[in-house]
Each structure stands twice: as C-alpha cells, then as structure tokens.
Curated annotation (Swiss-Prot):
Residues 1-21, 33-69 are annotated as: Disordered. It is found in: Chromosome. One of its GO terms (cellular component) is site of double-strand break. This is Shieldin complex subunit 1. GO terms for biological process: DNA repair; negative regulation of double-strand break repair via homologous recombination; positive regulation of double-strand break repair via nonhomologous end joining; positive regulation of isotype switching. Disulfide bonds: none annotated. InterPro entries: SHLD1, SHLD1_C. Signal peptide: none annotated. The gene is SHLD1. Residues 1-15, 33-43, 60-69 have a biased composition (Polar residues).
Amino acid sequence: MATQETTPGSQTEESNALDLPSAYDIRDYVLQRPSQQTNSEAFSSEEACSIPCSSDVDPDSSNLNTEQNDSWTSENFWFYPSVKGQPETKEEDDGLRKSLDKFYEVFGNPQPASGNSLSTSVCQCLSQKINELKDQENQTYTLRSFQMARVIFNQNGCSILQKHSRDAHFYPVREGSTSLQDEKLTPGLSKDIIHFLLQQNLMKDQ
C-alpha cells in the first residue's frame, strides 16, 4: 500500500515538472522577445517611410506645381526676351532709325511749287528745332514729334495754325468757337507742337 501511495505523488511531481518551462527556456524567451519587438518596429518604420506622402499623390498639388512653373516661364519671357526668342540686333535697330530719318527728310521738305510762304516759314521753324533736338540726348520722342509735324504740315497745309492764330484777321476768334484743347487734331500731330508754332508769331506777316 505504501508503494501504491507514493507512486501517484511521484507521477504528479513529474507531471508538474513537464508542464512548467525550465529556467533556461524562460531566459531564452525573455531575451528573444525584445529583439522581435525591435524587428517589428523597424519593419513598421520602413513601411511608413515607403508610403508616399499625400502631396506626392495629390493631383491638385501636381497641377499647382505645373502652374507655378508655367507662371515663372511666362514672367521670364517678358523680363528676359532672350529666353524664348532672339533679341533685336544693333544693326536692325540702326537700320530702322535710318529708314525713319529718311522718311521724315523726304516727306518733310516743302513742295517747291507750292508757293505758300506760311508753309515755308513753318517748315523752317520746325527744321531748326529738329536740328537742335538731334544734338540732345534722351529727346527721341520729342524729335520724332517735330519730324512728324513737319510731314503733316507739308502734306496738309497750315490751316490749323490759321484757325487758331489770334493775329490772323481773316480767321477771327468767335465766341463759342472750338478751342485747341477740345478739337480733334490730325493723328500724329501733337497739340504741344501747335502751341509751340503759335508762340513763334509766324502768322503776323501773313
């Protein structure tokens, strides 16, 4: 009987020894667990880095970048013409200036057969002013205005001066008449040129 009683106890102890892990197994389990967690965290971080950002896949943001590039190109086209096309050469610019000077010289001289002393006086006055402006810098616009006025007076006559001259007795100033400021002048003829010629008293002997 004693033998039978001890046998179940020994079996129970053996069963308990088999169910519980040994100290060696527990130590390996504890040491391996942090390394597994580290590998898992590293894998998660790699996945996070490999996921594209929202701005990379957002079609609106790509369109915005394209529009910004197009805007930059357009602005640089205006500020830097050489980006899209070749700038004008100095030879072309000089050729254009010479052509304009030739045009103003040919059509600005009074007609020999006109016999109009007023047209001759106006042409001489304008020619003198043109020669003065040619020797001055930064007066290109004023020079072209006087040259164009000489061409217009030579082709159309000087009736505009006779109309607005207070010294012309056959063109008296009437009340309610149109003033120079309100009148629509010939295209290309500046009102400043009219005022300049009226101040020269060219009409006093006419």
